[in-house]
UniProtKB/Swiss-Prot annotation:
Gene3D superfamilies: HUPs (3.40.50.620), Isoleucyl-tRNA Synthetase, Domain 1 (1.10.730.10), Valyl/Leucyl/Isoleucyl-tRNA synthetase, editing domain (3.90.740.10). It comes from Streptococcus pneumoniae (strain Hungary19A-6). GO terms for molecular function: aminoacyl-tRNA deacylase activity; ATP binding; leucine-tRNA ligase activity. The gene is leuS. Keywords: Aminoacyl-tRNA synthetase, ATP-binding, Cytoplasm, Ligase, Nucleotide-binding, Protein biosynthesis. This is Leucine--tRNA ligase.
Length: 833
């Protein structure tokens, strides 16, 4: 057979690996370890798409490579299976979310196995398994005991269509929910919060120790948002009330001409005048309908209402009006700001909108035209006049502290993590609220608190989760007769994914989250591969939980993931009309190399776009595996371009990868394999071993495959193939195309064993040196010949070879040779007359 029969070979080796537990995690303590982690998927009803295997193939290549290098490799897979989609589907169809999830997992697992990934399935985890979420609940009880899990009445992002509140991070810039695109409104509710802010400084500082993309670290730094400045206290005129503002520029206090409170600020109702009460109430209602992102959009029109009250500027005693405006958030800082319109563009626009005073306190701009936001020497600032920014800040902070109306302060943009969901399909929060007003955590001996099975999973309508409908589960009685009620909120999907990488290390332990010695052996994760969309949410939450567990002495490292890599996106093919509107692929026909709209006949422009059901451009890996084979899909996705680049899917590229694998198959099965080395492939083979090794280490898989192609081209020019080079080449291609490699290994090595643990080939540096070199022959200063000669020949040998060359002899025929100048490894210059 002259081609690679993937339909026979791939299932054969997948069966072998499963039967022999080929990829069971090594436990030899004398070996180094390598922990390769994929971001585990949510098992949706749609199954895998071709974007999933890109990251999975990358970690699989590394895992297979490290096994061959003698490492114990931990390469696991599991399921992030709680969450809204399964529950929404169950509500829409009447099906059990547990059954739906189990079916989806089975389908995902089938698809993953068909791609030949070397996962240790003995370590599979599922966040919906009570044996797993027992430990999610255990972590929560520890957070509760340490005061890091607490209840608070907070304004939440309420999504009526989902019947639940969502975290700030789950609200899109347009004010809709990330899940479903539903409207989000602000609503005060009793919620569980996790005090991630207690770890803000450590989460910020420890980023410097991580081998992560700088863009991801910057996103986390910005989300944590450390600011150094001062808290300043403003008294409310004619009352005993006061409020605090945080400012990074206390030196501009003399330019503060009004203050702004968040509409939800606790002082608003108390200080609002009778005349302004109706306007303030209306504005507060309108603000409650907007998300935080919509409220803080810099481009939106400035709105606000005066409360009728005045604050006293502590530095000059001036009375300045107190406004409310929705761009100030109660959840950020103190919920109050001092406005310096001369030097802040948003304040300037607000002042212009409502005809408020603008007082310049930094020289250098024309504050009537726009806010001057650069630095300058202070003016109109009494004892700060003439000072620069740094000196003025130091002086005003000292003054505020001396007068008792302010102090230096460090704040963070980071808010505590909203941890409750009013849904059924999530981990029950293990807390009981007693009728005597106390609350206690469910004892560890009673964990897991199992999610009760019910068909009635619709939201309760009261703002509580459907668990509030389940009286038998809900109501409990203490030994002393005191009645209690279980917490009805469930945990968000982020809970189970915040620590799953730890459970892989010891997935069947019934006594503890994981064994201490095993955690010491495997942590930190050596490489974590997944999408950049998880930069803030999952990665920040996982770091927080890990640091908390470090403080408890559960884990031995400060950070969970030493190296992070974000793969790019695989884009689909799409088509645009003359307006730029996207056209679904089933509305497109190809004629003479161009693309046309089936209905209108308009010629369309082909362009890459994110794969989506609506555009009908989603590529199913099952179809690719059926037609081309799993190895082709793996090689193609790694050869498309750099791993972190976003690149359009190409059927032609897929076919090219398949042709390459067929050439590999023919090379090994058709060439005569020799026990003796004739030296013809010494250089290219050793170059290939070196290049592929180095490029796998640096995740440059596309250039590694390109080098494998170079070797195949060179080897095909030879009649025979040295057996050690054939074996070495098969080992080099094995991480990329493991099924093909296993099959070819049997034909060459004839051991009957898997190639998986055969030692990785090495290269001989001496063979990388060129044996031959090109020299030029000049006659009368003009190049007349180029000759390949052995390296480092003497002058005499070079001269002899040059004069014997037929071209040279023809040029000097009948002429007298005056002089021959030979420069070893460079040229021969012949002077004639």
């Amino acid at each position: 057979m002259s081609f690679y029969n993937h339909k026979e070979i791939e299932p054969k080796w997948q069966g072998y690996w499963a039967e022999h537990h080929t990829f069971k995690t090594g436990t030899d303590a004398s070996k180094p370890k390598f922990y390769a982690l994929d971001m585990f998927p949510y098992p949706s009803g749609a199954g895998l798409h071709v974007g999933h295997p890109e990251g999975y193939t990358a970690t699989d290549i590394l895992s297979r490579y490290k096994r061959a290098q003698g490492y114990n490799v931990l390469h696991p897979m599991g399921w992030d299976a709680f969450g809204l989609p399964a529950e929404q589907y169950a509500m829409d169809t009447g099906n059990d979310p547990a059954e739906f999830t189990a079916e989806n997992i089975a389908n995902f697992k089938r698809q993953i196995n068909a791609l030949g990934f070397s996962y240790d399935w003995d370590r599979e985890v599922n966040t919906t398994d009570p044996n797993y979420y027992k430990w999610t609940q255990w972590i929560f009880t520890k957070l509760y005991e340490k005061g890091l899990a607490y209840e608070a009445e907070v304004p939440v992002n309420w999504v009526e269509e989902l019947g639940t509140a969502i975290a700030n991070e789950e609200v899109l810039p347009d004010g809709t929910s990330e899940r479903g695109g539903y409207p989000v409104v602000r609503k005060p509710m009793r919620q569980w919060m996790l005090k991630i802010t207690a770890y803000a400084e450590r989460l910020l500082n420890d980023l410097d120790e991580l081998d992560w993309p700088e863009s991801i670290k910057d996103m986390q730094r910005n989300w944590i948002g450390k600011s150094t400045g001062a808290n300043v206290t403003f008294k409310v005129k004619g009352t005993d009330k006061e409020f605090t503002v945080f400012t990074t520029r206390p030196d501009t206090l003399f330019g503060a001409t009004f203050t702004v409170l968040a509409p939800e600020h606790e002082l608003v109702d108390a200080i609002t005048s009778t005349e302004q009460a109706e306007a303030v109430a209306d504005y507060k209602h309108q603000a409650s309908l907007k998300s935080d992102l919509a409220r803080t959009d810099l481009a939106k029109e400035k709105t606000g209402v005066w409360t009728g009250a005045y604050a006293i500027n502590p530095v000059n005693g001036k009375e300045i009006p107190i406004w409310i405006a929705d761009y100030v958030l109660a959840s950020y800082g103190t919920g109050a700001v001092m406005a310096v319109p001369a030097h802040d563009q948003r304040d300037w626009e607000f002042a212009k909108q409502f005809d408020l005073p603008i007082v310049e306190v930094l020289e250098g701009g024309n504050v009537e035209e726009a806010a001057y936001t650069e630095d300058g020497l202070h003016v109109n600032s009494d004892f700060l006049d003439g000072l620069n920014k740094e000196d003025a800040i130091a002086k005003i902070v000292a003054w505020l502290e001396e007068k008792g109306c302010g102090q230096e302060k460090v704040t963070y943009r980071l808010r505590d993590w909203l941890f409750s969901r009013q849904r059924y399909w999530g981990e029950p929060i293990p807390i009981i609220h007693w009728e005597d007003g106390t609350s206690t955590a469910v004892p560890e001996s009673e964990l897991p608190l199992v999610l009760p099975v019910t068909k009635d999973i619709r939201p309760s309508g009261t703002g509580e989760s459907p668990l509030a409908n389940l009286t038998d589960w809900l109501e409990v009685t203490r030994e002393d007769g005191v009645k209690g009620r279980r917490e009805t909120n469930t945990m968000p999907q982020w809970a189970g994914s915040s620590w799953y990488y730890l459970r892989y290390i010891d997935p069947h332990n019934t006594e503890k989250l994981a064994d201490e010695d095993l955690l010491k052996q495997w942590l930190p994760v050596d490489i974590y591969v997944g999408g950049a969309e998880h930069a803030v949410l999952h990665l920040l939450y996982a770091r927080f939980w890990h640091k908390f567990l470090y403080d408890l002495g559960v884990v031995p490292t400060k950070e969970p993931f030493q190296k992070l890599f974000n793969q790019g996106m695989i884009l689909g093919t799409s088509y645009r009309d003359h307006r730029g509107a996207l056209v679904a692929t089933d509305k497109v026909e190809k004629r003479d190399g161009s693309f046309f709209h089936v209905e209108t006949g308009e010629e369309l422009e082909q362009a890459p776009a994110k794969m989506s059901k609506s555009l009908k451009n989603v590529v199913n890996p099952d179809d690719v595996v059926e037609q081309y084979g799993a190895d082709t899909l793996r090689v193609y996705e790694m050869f498309m371009g750099p791993l972190d680049a976003s690149i359009a899917w190409s059927e032609e590229g897929l076919e090219g990868s398949r042709k390459f694998l067929d050439r590999v198959y023919r090379l090994i099965t058709s060439k005569e394999i020799l026990a003796e080395n004739n030296g013809a492939l010494d250089k290219v083979y050793n170059e290939t071993v070196k290049a592929v090794t180095e490029q796998i280490e640096s995740l440059k898989f596309n250039t590694a495959i390109a080098q494998l192609m170079v070797f195949v081209n060179a080897a095909n020019k030879e009649d025979k193939l040295y057996v050690d080079y054939a074996k070495g080449f098969i080992q080099l291609i094995a991480p990329f195309a493991p099924h093909l490699a296993e099959e070819l290994w049997q034909t060459v090595a004839e051991t009957g064993e898997s190639i998986s643990y055969v030692a990785w080939p090495t290269w001989d540096e001496s063979k990388l040196v060129e044996d031959e070199i090109e020299i030029v022959v000049q006659i009368k200063g003009k190049v007349r010949a180029k000759l390949m000669v052995a390296k480092d020949l003497s002058r005499e040998e070079l001269q002899e070879i040059a004069l014997a060359d037929e071209k040279v002899k023809a040029e000097i025929d009948g002429k007298e040779i005056v002089k021959v100048i030979a420069v070893p490894n460079k040229l021969v210059n012949i002077v004639v007359k």
